[in-house]
Amino acid sequence: MFKFNEEKGQLKCSFCGKTQDQVRKLVAGPGVYICDECIELCTEIVEEELGTEEEVEFKDVPKPHEIREILDEYVIGQENAKKSLAVAVYNHYKRINSNSKIDDVELSKSNISMIGPTGSGKTLLAQTLARILNVPFAIADATSLTEAGYVGEDVENILLKLIQAADYDVEKAEKGIIYIDEIDKVARKSENPSITRDVSGEGVQQALLKILEGTVASVPPQGGRKHPHQEFIQIDTTNILFICGGAFDGIEQIIKRRLGQKVIGFGAENKIEDLEKEVLLSKVLPEDLLRFGLIPEFIGRLPVIASLEPLDEKALVEILTKPKNALVKQYTKMLELDDVELEFEEDALSEIAKKAIERKTGARGLRSIIEGIMLDVMFDLPSRDDIEKCVITGATVADGESPRLVLKDGTVVNKDTKTSA
């Protein structure tokens, strides 16, 4: 703070030009001065601009139909899951806008649980939602979490990932999305409460409760364990949307048992047994998750349940070709950089889809199958300048035959050398 000294003469504010006699205080900097009135005015301008930015951020939340249309560009199938997610996300950010206004009715948060087999698109759906809304997004693995005080990650480290995704802008992170994968792996081992401590199962569920509901959490800036005399980042989780996903292997048997108890008469059991997995998953209820091993308090904080179906051959073929960043488009672009045209025949795409179904890896396994097929092609083609086109046939995928190569002079080469798929 600058103090008045008569010997130095009158000092003026560098911004408004008022003398020190005309204002209450002057703050001195290196060769400049600012009065209390200008400080107050600048503060108002900055606060007004920041307030406007905050309002604009979620002013134009896409409508559920618009959200689903964008999801359709990246994710094939899963129509019911897309609809559930579109409505839940729209309501969540509409709620944030509503709660920022003074009102008697405060809307509570609806987190989401996604149930579906490996490779059905759970993570991709969550990532695409964050991209649509332009909000910070973080993925956490529930299997690495443990209850506080035990070896493993504290649940607060999930929040640190979101803060890092927001470039340490806490206010922005407080309106982000967190996807917790493998949530089914923290289910307790039996339906009944255990007398022994389950630090990586029920203990993690207990630790996540407050964060899911909404609390001001203390996060260590460098991650790791908390310890005394350490600085923390304070983050309010009230407006963070949590999406918890898992395969929940075996839950269809729990659903079958529940449905079987409600059907009476001869042949009732056979009717339930005939139901396919995707039909069963669409009938999942909170009581099924309870029997699977999630605690009631945890289930209560995930009111929206979106079930995803296992992908069939037709859906996998569409995944290979239709989305904006489809694998076939990616590999075609890659070979274009070597001035070679790449073509996948229809039966080749079908064979790739069949292999993925056999391996039970869903869409996630498609890339590894194509990598195996394309390995020799991508190894040899850069060294040759006589090839115009490479055709992947059904035999290339199913029997390991070499791809058909069309040379620039029109010659077609199809060697019998085996390639691994």
Swiss-Prot record:
InterPro entries: AAA+_ATPase, ATP-dep_Clp_protease_ClpX, ATPase_AAA_core, Clp_ATPase_C, Clp_protease_ATP-bd_su_ClpX, ClpX_bact, P-loop_NTPase, Znf_CppX_C4. One of its GO terms (molecular function) is ATP hydrolysis activity. Zn(2+) binds at residues 13, 16, 35, 38. Keywords: ATP-binding, Chaperone, Metal-binding, Nucleotide-binding, Zinc. One of its GO terms (cellular component) is HslUV protease complex. Residues 1-54 form the ClpX-type ZB domain. Component of the ClpX-ClpP complex. Forms a hexameric ring that, in the presence of ATP, binds to fourteen ClpP subunits assembled into a disk-like structure with a central cavity, resembling the structure of eukaryotic proteasomes. Belongs to the ClpX chaperone family. ATP-dependent specificity component of the Clp protease. It directs the protease to specific substrates. Can perform chaperone functions in the absence of ClpP. This is ATP-dependent Clp protease ATP-binding subunit ClpX. It comes from Bacillus pumilus (strain SAFR-032).
